Amino acid sequence: MKRREFITLLGGAAVWPLAARAQQSGKLPTIGFLGGATASAWSNWSAAFVHRFRELGWSEGRTVLIEYRWADGRHERAAEIAAEFVRLKVDVILTSGGVLLAAKQATSTIPIVFAVANDPVGAGFVSSLARPGGNITGLSLQTTDLAAKRLELLREVVPGIRRLGVLANIGNAAAVPEIDEVQAAARILGLDVAMFEMRLPEDIASAFAAFKSGAEAIYVCTDPLVLAHRARINTLALAARLPTIYGPREHVEAGGLMSYGANFPDLFRRAADLVDKILRGAKPGDIPVEQPTKFDLVVNLTTAKALGIEVPPTLLARADEVIE
């Protein structure tokens, strides 16, 4: 999907110097917004980003232009969008870990801000969290503790679980660290893992056909393709009577059982601060990569009832949100 949107932003006093420079050059500062999934899947995240930009004082037509593009979970499309942003000479690219590689491969000069990425140092996106270097900075998620915590939550809901299904898009290099961490955590907990590596939407049905006989619950790795098809995944999981756990809460809002992870709208709000700094003259390589400190547990009781699962009261008491 291609569209150009001028974002109506209130305020503007804080960015008058930049506005004056924009008028002198005849070109508004432009943000290339590279969404890894669909516009609807990212709607809460993009809205959070824009709302924070309003608070920072940016104003429509006078100070900023945002170009939205959506990869729909397809990495080849993400590469096309990144190349387009280079041709458009955008001032900053905003994206996330699932399609961050496409942006990195497209340019080494245009600043890139990732709202969320798993282990950006290990993946080679930045030199270090404190001193990223290069043209990239953003917000990092480390999955080591998160994967183990999610499996512990699954064990509370499915006592005695022995066989774990893992659904992951192996075509996404950013998913590999999470896959490794899930397998390591499963070994520690004594769980047998049935891994299904999807690459296309058509693989989802095949995965659940395999999981029916080889899993008691499903861990779904975070990925743009998975997010774009979250409703179908949850429908198949319910039909197979399989509890699911995710990272982003959006999966649970679409019918998944549980999620445990960072609040993605909060990450996109913080990413707006980083983009703001860069548009005011800061170099991305000098802006430390940040890490979230709060993680939310969300439980969908409607899904639990449909699965015939009684969620322990002790777990519900710890939940940040319960969907009924």
Which functions belong to the PLM regions below?
Residues M1-E324:
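Short hydrophobic alpha-helices and adjacent helix-cap/hinge residues
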